[in-house]
């Protein structure tokens, strides 16, 4: 669980900014979305392979541009 203590003379905005940064780095939202519903292992592997291919194509296009 992500928690942040407010420091002396620190504004709420700065504290919120620190919280958001910790929240993103911890991957809470990403993990929640990944576990929102069950995906069969075969489908999960297929999706990962297709994402990997797209990422490789984009990287290759950027190198050739």
UniProtKB/Swiss-Prot annotation:
Species this protein is from: Pelodictyon phaeoclathratiforme (strain DSM 5477 / BU-1)
Disordered as annotated region, ranges: 45-65
Keyword Chaperone: no
Family the entry assigns: Belongs to the bacterial ribosomal protein bS21 family.
Biased composition (Basic residues): 48-57
GO cellular component, one term: ribonucleoprotein complex
A single MF term (Gene Ontology): structural constituent of ribosome
Phylogenetic lineage: Bacteria, Pseudomonadati, Chlorobiota, Chlorobiia, Chlorobiales
Protein name: Small ribosomal subunit protein bS21
HAMAP family: Ribosomal_bS21 (MF_00358)
GO biological process: translation
Gene behind the chain: rpsU
């Amino acid at each position: 669980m992500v928690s942040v203590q407010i420091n002396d003379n620190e504004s709420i905005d700065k504290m919120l900014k620190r919280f958001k940064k910790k929240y993103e780095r911890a991957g809470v939202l990403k993990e929640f979305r990944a576990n929102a519903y069950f995906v069969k292992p075969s489908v999960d592997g297929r999706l990962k392979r297709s994402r990997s291919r797209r990422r490789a194509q984009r990287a290759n296009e950027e190198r050739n541009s």
